[in-house]
Amino acid sequence: MEQEIKSLLYELGIPVIQREKIVAPNCVSIHYDLVKIEHLAQVEKKVKFLSAYLHKDIVYQKSEIAHFSLRLPREDDKFVKFYDEEYDYIFNKKLTKDRDIFMGVDNNNVPRVFNLDDMPHILIAGTTGSGKSVMLNNIICCLLRNAKKECRPSFTMIDTKRVELSMYRNLPDCDIATTAEQAVELLEGVCYRLESRYAMMESQGIRKISSDYFRHIVVIEELGDLMMATNGAVEKYIVKIAQLGRACGVHLIVATQHPVVRVITGAIKANISCRIALQVTSGIDSRNILGHNGAEKLKGKGDCLLKLPDKANEIHLQCPLVTDSDITRAINAFIGG
């Protein structure tokens, strides 16, 4: 394919020298040097022709003055496994801090690790088959797998589907709600926990808890169902947790198949700045989660865009595939640790 692209560019009057080819789990990036720098302005104009001619969704990226790259989708997507020999070193070398999360592999085939402290609340959206639940399990399993014994987190989980988070029911210090009524009760309890922590901080004269203070993680598997079942009554609890949780070590991880305005309200969106967009059904859904189109063009099965707080551009990732046996291993490591 790269030779065909090089030949087509030459026929279009843009001779290039191929610098390198990077094969990532969900795409191939081919980097070129221009023979003549004045041809750079022409390249972007010709990419649409290349895409149509090759029947590929080719993305043009300008980098250095006389250098550019073209990104093509892979013919055969590669899954990134949670426990994978190729990326196993991540748990031994890269995940060195408590709350480090292996979010996936980027377009340069680089494993990307981020800390929950830098993205204290996370909003995940994706349609059926997009990998939404897998990404949610990946985040939970990373937190379990990498937890330090002296400051292991506690959990509040809301699973109105009753089965998605059922494997975590035997975790120590983990409450799971399976009905809307239980969910409201647990979220109200988390808000009391917030007040208690703030009272402790006030009495000690501190504005933010230390990094080694144990965290509480609130996981909502499907916000859409919960908002519908409670007629939006849970919104005030979610917003309060998002507004006050960061300073006192309470984190919120919310997922939904329905990233519409009545589910991801303005107040919720304004207070959860880290977003993970997997494949969604429309540009409208993409705009509600990311602020622009793009997520509707993702391929599903873990293909995602990660928007970090205070960062303008998203990171394109292939998230790890987490199996039931991976979840069991992570739980055992957490309990045994």
What are these regions (language model features)?
Residues 4-18, 26-45, 49-53, 62-71, ...:
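P-loop NTPase catalytic phosphate-binding loop
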